[in-house]
């Protein structure tokens, strides 16, 4: 009897929140409100998420956990798959001003039936790295757009 193989890929990206001085500046509070809004309505960030539930097990106002239910179009994750995602704003951050704000997104991808080190695994690493970086940038751009449009007041 053979053992099923599974490929696991971990990646993290940090993107500046206020990179472009010509764009409206986001404060930490505004960005956190935007993350909450997107967590309750993930389709606003990504069409490949069908639904979400913010779980009631938060330990503080600076963190929450949500369950995502994937839709069609998710890379390497089938429709209907449920994922748990932890979201937190690190405690004890020093406020060095808006230029010092970053979003760090950490992803862990599990892909069954792919051999670690195989060509398919390397292809997934390349594709998922691009997707993860793009997702982090999209979150920042979307929250900034909500601020400009007045949508953060609804969050």
UniProtKB/Swiss-Prot annotation:
Functional description taken from the UniProt entry: Nonribosomal peptide synthetase; part of the gene cluster that mediates the biosynthesis of acetylaranotin, a member of the epipolythiodioxopiperazine (ETP) class of toxins characterized by a disulfide-bridged cyclic dipeptide. The first step of acetylaranotin biosynthesis is performed by the NRPS ataP which produces diketopiperazine cyclo-L-Phe-L-Phe via the condensation of 2 phenylalanines (L-Phe). The ataC domain of ataTC then catalyzes the formation of bishydroxylation of cyclo-L-Phe-L-Phe.
InterPro entries assigned to the protein according to its UniProt record, in alphabetical order: AtaL, START-like_dom_sf
Highest taxon in the source lineage: Eukaryota
Annotated Gene3D superfamilies: 3.30.530.20
Phenotype upon loss of function: Impairs the production of acetylaranotin and accumulates chemically stable intermediate cyclo-L-phe-L-phe or shunt products such as 2-hydroxy-2'-ene-cyclo-L-Phe-L-Phe and 2-imino-10'-hydroxy-cyclo-L-Phe-L-Phe.
Name of a matching Pfam family: AtaL
Name of the protein in its database record: Acetylaranotin biosynthesis cluster protein L
Pathway(s): Mycotoxin biosynthesis
SUPFAM superfamilies linked to this entry: Bet v1-like
């Amino acid at each position: 009897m053979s053992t099923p193989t599974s490929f696991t890929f971990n990646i993290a990206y940090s993107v500046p929140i206020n990179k472009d001085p010509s764009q409206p500046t986001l404060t930490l509070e505004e960005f956190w409100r935007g993350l909450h809004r997107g967590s309750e309505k993930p389709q606003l960030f990504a069409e490949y998420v069908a639904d979400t539930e913010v779980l009631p097990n938060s330990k503080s106002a600076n963190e929450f956990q949500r369950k995502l239910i994937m839709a069609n179009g998710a890379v390497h994750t089938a429709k209907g798959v449920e994922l748990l995602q932890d979201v937190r704003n690190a405690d004890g951050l020093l406020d060095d001003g808006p230029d010092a704000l970053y979003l760090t997104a950490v992803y862990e991808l599990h892909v069954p039936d792919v051999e670690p080190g195989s060509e398919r695994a390397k292809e997934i690493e390349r594709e998922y790295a691009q997707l993860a970086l793009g997702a982090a940038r999209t979150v920042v751009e979307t929250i900034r757009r909500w601020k400009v449009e007045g949508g953060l007041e609804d969050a």
